A protein has these predicted regions:
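ATPase nucleotide-binding modules
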Residues: 226-271, 276-292, 305-322, 351
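The feature captures the beta-strand-to-loop junction immediately N-terminal to the Walker
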Residues: 35-37
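ABC ATPase nucleotide-binding domain
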Residues: 5, 25, 61, 329-331
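Pre-Walker A (P-loop) beta-loop-beta motif of ABC nucleotide-binding domains
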Residues: 22-33
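Helix-to-loop junction immediately C-terminal to a conserved catalytic motif
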Residues: 50
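ATP-binding/catalytic-site motifs of ATP-hydrolyzing domains
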Residues: 59-61, 65, 211
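ABC ATPase nucleotide-binding domains
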Residues: 31, 69-229
């Protein structure tokens, strides 16, 4: 098992900065998710940890040892890729066994370790099939077993569910969560999918344009986003964000007025609130809108309206019904809201 320390690491190509001043300690046995949009630097960060990319600045330590100059094979990490990376000429058994042969593990251990890894991902009945005879989910499980059989200090998983359909993603996600609990190996997982991040992680690192935006537990990041980028990236739907003016403790914008912000400074601000925290009303309220769309989600109905240049979503009961274009009120209180500085995007903390 291993603790990983990233000491102000950075990666640049000429004037382009891919990862900037990334500083973090990852605890032994922690499941850490690097989350962000394409091009944010999350995969580059993982590749630096693996040794597949050189570090431009800073240090990477695994178990207190600086590994900047170590080859990937000497870092004792195992990677699982989006593309599975299986050998088509080998059956499942030999694909799983291959890392043991490369690392010259005593042959007497091979069969037991392969069978144990295969059992963990429920592949015992597929050991003599070639990759072409497997489904996408089964291939990804072979890739997981091949990483498990190594018994590495660290698992690195780069968008391992991206090629799977929605149903397989759910079941494989649950399997990864279960394996993490069973194996107790430090794991770094890269994804652009905030649902994967929220369901799998002990902690989430949200990245954008090579910069860490926030580090915290999934609950922390959902309930207390550090800035408007995190607020708009986490949640389905994302947090509602409405620009307006704060004066004498009252937030005002088109068709909207919310009081109770006396401890915040006056100025141009952005109000944020979650869809499930506001309430739809047939009478006048803090926000008065015309319904833009209704979406039945099964357990609830999503009511969407336009406020200025923003779309605002609010969850209502599953049997809620109203005509498109009808006027409704949305009850919002200061206690469910966050205020962000409109210029910097940073969330205000109470004075």
């Amino acid at each position: 098992m291993a603790k990983i320390q990233l000491r102000n690491i950075g990666k640049s190509w000429g004037s382009f900065v891919g990862v900037d001043n990334f500083d973090l300690t990852i605890a032994d046995k922690e499941f850490l998710v690097l989350l962000g949009p394409s091009g944010c630097g999350k995969t580059t960060t993982m590749r630096m940890i693996a040794g597949l990319e050189d570090v431009t600045e800073g240090e990477i330590l695994i178990d207190e040892q600086v590994v900047n100059d170590l080859d990937p094979k000497d870092r004792d990490v195992a990677m699982v890729f989006q593309s599975y990376a299986l050998y088509p000429n080998m059956d499942v058994y030999e694909n799983i066994r291959f890392p043991l042969k490369v690392r010259k593990t005593p042959k007497a251990q091979h069969h037991e370790r392969v069978m144990k890894a295969a059992a963990m991902v429920e592949l015992e009945d597929f050991l003599h099939r070639k990759p072409a005879e497997l489904s996408g989910g089964q291939r990804q499980r072979v890739a997981l077993a091949r990483a498990i059989v190594r018994k590495p200090k660290v698992f690195l998983m780069d968008e391992p569910l991206s090629n799977l359909d929605a149903k397989l993603r759910v079941s494989t996600r649950a399997q990864i969560k279960n394996l993490s609990h069973e194996l107790q190996v430090t794991t770094i997982y890269v994804t652009h999918d905030q649902i994967e991040a929220m369901t799998l992680a002990d902690r989430v690192v949200v990245m954008n344009k090579g910069i860490v935006q926030q580090v915290g537990t999934p609950t922390d990041i959902y309930d207390n986003p550090a800035n408007t980028f995190v607020a708009s990236f986490i949640g389905s739907p994302a947090m509602n964000l409405v620009a307006g003016t704060l004066e004498a403790g009252i937030f005002k914008t088109q068709n909207m007025e919310v009081s109770g912000f006396d401890r915040f400074p006056d100025g141009q601000v952005t109000l944020g609130f979650r869809a499930e925290d506001a309430k739809v009303s047939s009478s006048a309220a803090e926000l008065n809108i015309q319904v833009y769309s209704l979406e039945l989600l099964g357990d609830s109905t999503m009511v969407t309206a336009r406020v200025g240049e923003s779309l605002v979503a609010v969850k209502a009961a599953k049997d809620y019904s109203v005509a498109i274009g009808a006027s409704v009120g949305i009850h919002i209180t200061a206690s469910i809201c966050h205020l962000f500085d409109t210029q910097s995007g940073q969330r205000f903390k109470e004075n």
